[in-house]
From Swiss-Prot:
Belongs to the orthopoxvirus OPG051 family. InterPro entries: Orthopox_F7. This is Protein OPG051. The lineage of its organism: Viruses, Varidnaviria, Bamfordvirae, Nucleocytoviricota, Pokkesviricetes. It comes from Vaccinia virus (strain Western Reserve). Keywords: Early protein. Induction: Expressed in the early phase of the viral replicative cycle.
């Protein structure tokens, strides 16, 4: 199992959403299936942190979609 963390713009995956996690990873709109970290089996889980967002504090008018479009940086994999 791969768990993706840090998606403030992500949406839940369900039957109503047309796009899935793979669409988000390719830069399109999509959704994530959020999991509780306490429920993961340590031997079978891999945690990935991303996407990360930078916010310019001087520009208070930046909205979430603007941040997603201009400041998205994906970390491939983080193991610990």
């Amino acid at each position: 199992m791969t768990l993706v963390m840090g998606s403030c713009c992500g949406r839940f995956c369900d039957a109503k959403n047309k796009n899935k996690k793979e669409d988000v990873e390719e830069g399109r709109e999509g959704c994530y299936n959020y999991k509780n970290l306490n429920d993961l089996d340590e031997s079978e889980a891999r945690v990935e942190f991303g996407p990360l967002y930078m916010i310019n504090e001087e520009k208070s008018d930046i909205n979430t979609l603007d941040i997603k479009r201009r400041y998205r940086h994906t970390i491939e994999s983080v193991y610990f």
